[in-house]
Amino acid sequence: MAAFILTPIPTPRHDGKDMLIRLAADQKKLRILTGCLLLAALPASWAQIRSADAALPEAPQPAPIPAIALIRANGIAAHPEDADPSGREPQDPPIVAMAPHPEDSIYWISGQANIIFQGRLPFHSAYEGTNSFRNSAEYKTSMVGTLFTAIRRNRSIRYNTDFIFDLESAGGRGLSEALGLAGFTNLDVVRNPNLGSTPYIARYEIHQIFGLTQKTVSQDPGPFALAPSVPVRRIEFRIGKVTLPDFFDVNGPGSDSHLQFMNWTIDNNGAWDYAADTRGYTVGGMAEYDDRAWSVRYGIFAMPTVANGIDMDWAFSRAHGQNGEFELRQSLIRDRKGVTRLLFFANRAHMGTYREAVEDFLNGSDTATYGVTVPTITLHAHFGALKYGFGYNTEQELTPNLRVFGRFGWNEGQHESYAYTEVDQTVLAGADYYGTRWHRPVDKIGLAVVSNAIKRDHQNYLHYGGLGFLLGDGNLNYGRETIVESYYNWHAWRGMFYALDVQHIDNPGYNRDRGAAWVGSVRAHIDF
């Protein structure tokens, strides 16, 4: 059996003056970037903005048919039912974009920019490895900008067609290069910082609706669905380049890192290893049936050639991700909104198994053949290997201002984590509260707790020094990774939002020998 020597790493000491100088410089850059984004986010003239005040659009509402996660791309929904408790006449709803979007247009042009500054204090660490969340003080800034464009070619209510094309740029870096945590602290961070910030095509989709009835229901037009009304019963098809969380595992209080929580395993189900490249996108198709109170959707999409890879495997016979979801819009409380979703996934890809990697390392065969000194799962990858799992997702309004939500996720855990993050089981509970009580109806407070876990084979792999695409401390004293996150999102003006956020991470990377860690964040967001 191979032996390992783990060198204790003391908590680094830093020159306070030097840290303050670097922090001030970084904050100055952040202010400059925010100012530039504000100038870029004013496509309408002053006259257009003044005229928009005379005829404000209706406040966006949670869609009765939430097949499209509009909240993820186009800002938050103001609740019209959040009446002022003082009994005064209702005020016009606030505008939540730099310029309003006409509901009857066949074109859609909008955008968003998101800047997140994160800093971490030093924390206890008995040792570090290649993929550790570093224990020294650190701060990083990430930037994401997206241009949403779409055209509605067939304006028939029963047979609507949308063509969607989005461009995106992601820059900056995450703390510790986004390594060392299963629930990383910033969803905007690209897991391969070497890709750079060059703009890329994020989405190209064809969206087709086939109505099954003449009866319609209204919906808020957005960048992924332009029709202001759709048939109550309908079939929808999408084909092209997408990101799966736009359509699956959507959750009103917990899906948007730009206006809500920032942690990977709070905004998405951490155990859902959904098909995606490093940036979070894939190519494929999906179908969806919608009725008044329920929906069912299914899609098949391309998988990457390697774990966390940017290149996709186009041989669908051996590599693909299948996803299905049932959604029931049934509230537990009268006159309040409530939704429950059941998700399943089954991925086939060039994956290895943790147990095989550990066994061949311990018996010396991998060391003799390949010269490796730790278990190496990539040496045991098999084409067509199957990884599967399921998820539960719920949200419920308790009052006009208060919503609670939760998730549970599980996957079989024998095959390597491949596309999203290294979680085999997750449990989440949280809530958000609108600021109507203090006359800030679009402001919001959020609080959530998520606890992530991995299976025994995965634990052993990390214990003997193996590396995943995110984790690897060189050793593992296993414990559940538990994260508490809280934020306040402040609506400054029109489409400008600022947020303060704090996260507490217990057992980072499932390691009881490290942590706990605190991460603070400041976020600037613009919708235009």
Model-inferred region functions:
Residues 107, 141-147, 200-206, 235, ...:
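Hydrophobic, lipid-facing positions within transmembrane beta-strands of outer-membrane proteins
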Residues 4, 20-23, 39, 43-137, ...:
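N-terminal periplasmic/intermembrane-space "pro-region" immediately following the signal or transit peptide
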Residues 97-109, 121-122, 150-163, 211-234, ...:
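Short loop/turn motifs that connect adjacent beta-strands in outer-membrane beta-barrel proteins
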Residues 180-196, 200, 215-325, 465-476:
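Surface-exposed coil loops of outer-membrane beta-barrel proteins
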Residues 203-215, 447, 516-528:
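Outer-membrane beta-barrel "beta-signal"
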Residues 151-155, 208-210, 241, 288-291, ...:
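Residue-level signature of outer-membrane beta-barrel architecture
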Residues 113-119, 165-169, 237-241, 298-302, ...:
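Transmembrane beta-barrel strands of outer-membrane/channel proteins
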Residues 327, 343-384, 405, 412, ...:
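Outer membrane beta-barrel transmembrane domains
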